[in-house]
């Protein structure tokens, strides 16, 4: 499977299902790559998969694609030492890949069943940008006949908050779109904050759409619970202590990074994500359970070992 074919397959997966997370599309693409690979050794197969992950990261520079690809590779590679026969080993790797994919496809449902219990009747919720997991949680709350209203930031520069507002209107949920700059003003009106995450880092902090950090700071200042909902395939081996520690490959879009390689100055560009420290987060709802930020490192070690 050539690079061009790999990218085309990845983009077709994304286009075919708008609700599919980019990491899930990447894992489906890697599974298809695994099935079509013509290699004859396990070492060669691993090298080809690693190169395929790098190719996908060059197309979509989000944290989730990087962490999802690495976790997929680790999960299927656990069998490589068990069988000496290559064809048998590859067959088991494909089976494990399909098992991994089926597990992560249930992630949002598990998270929604855990988190919606924290939404009380009459709650006023603040959220940020467009998150498929947050939307799934709110769908579950609607199905449970809970009455609540949502404030959502417009989320510049792509106005993804308006996309979220439109989705919530279809659920007949009262929605108010607010300016990104109005987070501090609106915070006193809300009961809780729920956001998604592009990546969950080793210390229990998160990397998410730009503006998440300021929302967490305001929530902490006004003693409002700040909840994060994220699938476990977004757990990434990264330990940032501040904004500068987040790698540029995650901060900026892939197209922006290519233009920088061509000589353009990165100082003129706005980052797409920021880092929120664990001290600002109340709880994380994942398919592994409800975690405190301090418990994330233990779960991350289990995933990557």
Curated annotation (Swiss-Prot):
Gene3D superfamilies: Translation initiation factor eif-2b, domain 2, Translation initiation factor eIF-2B, N-terminal domain. Pfam families: IF-2B. The modification N6-acetyllysine is found at residue 35. Activated by the chemical integrated stress response (ISR) inhibitor ISRIB which stimulates guanine nucleotide exchange factor activity for both phosphorylated and unphosphorylated eIF2. Its main location: cytoplasm. Transmembrane segments: none annotated. The keyword Coiled coil does not apply. One of its GO terms (molecular function) is GDP binding. Keywords: Acetylation, Cytoplasm, Initiation factor, Protein biosynthesis. It is found in: Cytoplasm, Cytosol. The keyword Cell membrane does not apply. GO terms for biological process: cytoplasmic translational initiation; oligodendrocyte development; response to amino acid starvation; response to glucose; response to heat; response to peptide hormone; T cell receptor signaling pathway; translation. GO terms for cellular component: cytoplasm; cytosol; eukaryotic translation initiation factor 2 complex; eukaryotic translation initiation factor 2B complex; membrane; plasma membrane. Belongs to the eIF-2B alpha/beta/delta subunits family. Acts as a component of the translation initiation factor 2B (eIF2B) complex, which catalyzes the exchange of GDP for GTP on eukaryotic initiation factor 2 (eIF2) gamma subunit. Its guanine nucleotide exchange factor activity is repressed when bound to eIF2 complex phosphorylated on the alpha subunit, thereby limiting the amount of methionyl-initiator methionine tRNA available to the ribosome and consequently global translation is repressed. Component of the translation initiation factor 2B (eIF2B) complex which is a heterodecamer of two sets of five different subunits: alpha, beta, gamma, delta and epsilon. Subunits alpha, beta and delta comprise a regulatory subcomplex and subunits epsilon and gamma comprise a catalytic subcomplex. Within the complex, the hexameric regulatory complex resides at the center, with the two heterodimeric catalytic subcomplexes bound on opposite sides. This is Translation initiation factor eIF2B subunit alpha. It comes from Rattus norvegicus (Rat). The lineage of its organism: Eukaryota, Metazoa, Chordata, Craniata, Vertebrata.
């Amino acid at each position: 499977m050539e690079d061009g074919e790999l990218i085309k397959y990845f983009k077709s997966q994304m286009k075919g299902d708008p609700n599919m997370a980019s990491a899930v599309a990447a894992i489906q693409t890697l599974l298809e790559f695994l099935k079509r690979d013509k290699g004859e050794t396990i070492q060669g197969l691993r090298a080809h998969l690693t190169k395929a992950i790098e190719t996908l990261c060059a197309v979509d520079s989000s944290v989730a694609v990087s962490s999802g690809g690495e976790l997929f590779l680790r999960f299927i590679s656990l069998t490589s030492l068990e069988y000496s026969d290559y064809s048998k080993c590859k067959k088991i790797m494909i089976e494990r890949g399909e098992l991994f994919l089926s597990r992560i496809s249930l992630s949002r449902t598990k998270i929604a069943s855990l988190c919606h219990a924290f939404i009380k009747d009459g709650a006023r919720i603040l959220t940020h940008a467009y998150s498929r997991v947050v939307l799934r949680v709110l769908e579950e709350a609607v199905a449970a006949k809970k009455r609540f209203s949502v404030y959502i930031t417009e989320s510049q520069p792509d106005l993804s908050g308006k996309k979220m507002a439109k989705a919530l209107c279809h659920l007949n949920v009262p929605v108010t779109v607010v300016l990104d700059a109005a987070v501090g003003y609106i915070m006193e009106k809300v009961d809780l904050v729920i956001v998604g995450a592009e990546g969950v880092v080793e210390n229990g902090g998160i990397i998410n759409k730009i503006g998440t950090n300021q929302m967490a700071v305001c929530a902490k200042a006004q003693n409002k619970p700040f909840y994060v909902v994220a699938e476990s395939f977004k757990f990434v081996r990264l330990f940032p202590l501040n904004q500068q520690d987040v790698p540029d490959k995650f901060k900026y879009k892939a197209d922006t990074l290519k233009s920088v390689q061509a000589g353009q100055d990165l100082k003129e560009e706005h980052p797409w994500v920021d880092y929120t420290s664990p001290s600002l987060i109340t709880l994380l709802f994942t398919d592994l359970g409800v975690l405190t930020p301090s418990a994330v490192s233990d779960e991350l070690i289990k995933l990557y070992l």
